[in-house]
Design a protein with these regions (language model features):
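Charged, low-complexity intrinsically disordered segments and flexible loops
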Residues: 1-38
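Short amphipathic alpha-helix that is part of the acyltransferase structural core
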Residues: 25-70
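Acyl-donor binding region in acyl/amide transferases
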Residues: 44-47, 85, 91-192
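Extended mixed-charge, aromatic/glycine-enriched low-complexity segments
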Residues: 49, 53, 61, 65-66, ...
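A short acidic/basic microdomain associated with nuclease active sites
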Residues: 71-72, 149
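A short helix-loop-beta-strand connector motif used in the catalytic cores of GNAT acetyltransferases and
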Residues: 72-82, 87, 142
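Short hydrophobic/aromatic beta-strand or adjacent loop that forms the aromatic wall/cage
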Residues: 78, 191-196
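Short beta-strand-to-coil "C-cap" segments at the C-terminal boundary of structured domains/repeats
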Residues: 197-201
């Protein structure tokens, strides 16, 4: 049996269906779900374990569905969130220390590695969870001064970041991660990227 830590306790992790991954109480509802929210204001934003966050990302992320939990927890800082209504998930977010080795001030920055929204999430879910996470990180991560995230220019226009007060920090050409000395998994995208950032302090 595989275990994961939740609020400091080791809990059993089961093989669940897609509906059950979304459900915080699958054993009681058996994936039946709850009422569907009609407004993003009805969503409750809470921390979640990295396994569930990665599984939700695999369900919903249009461009980067693959992210292994071990690539998250090996970082100095990491935290995952979920947006729920009636104990059903509608969005997930995965943060960690910046993955770029040469990133300046890496010890005082957090990177939004993934933000995935379900198709049935209410309008403005992304902007609501971005705002809530900013306030949470400002309050609980006292050593973090900067938030960053990378936009895939082939699929997204950065509207959500712009509307949430983030600024463009840099633009870069897409490239493969695999090199002669280090073989990687198949790239999910090699399109150009824009790095957005938000100063917390």
């Amino acid at each position: 049996m595989v275990l994961f830590k939740c609020d400091g306790r080791e809990m059993p992790r089961m093989n669940l269906s897609a509906d059950n991954v979304r459900d915080s109480i699958p054993l009681f509802r058996n994936g039946g779900g709850g009422s569907i929210p009609t407004s993003a204001h009805q969503l409750l934003f809470v921390k979640t374990n990295v396994h569930r966050a990665c599984e939700l990302n695999a369900l919903w992320h249009s461009r980067f569905p693959k992210i292994h939990w071990s690539n998250v927890v090996r970082n100095k800082d990491y935290i995952c969130f979920v947006a729920e209504h009636d104990m059903m998930a509608y969005a997930s977010a995965i943060w960690s220390s910046p993955i770029a080795r040469n990133f300046e001030n890496a010890n005082t920055a957090l990177e939004l590695r993934r933000l995935a929204i379900s198709k049935d999430a209410p309008k403005n879910t992304a902007s609501r969870i971005l705002g809530w996470m900013r306030r949470y990180l400002l309050k609980h991560f006292h050593h973090i001064n900067l938030l960053i995230s990378y936009q895939d220019t082939e699929c997204h226009k950065g509207t959500i970041y712009k509307a949430s007060g983030w600024n463009i920090a840099s633009r870069s050409k897409g490239h493969k991660w695999t090199c002669r000395t280090r073989k990687r998994n198949k790239d999910q995208s090699i399109s150009d990227k824009i790095r957005w950032q938000l100063c917390l302090r």
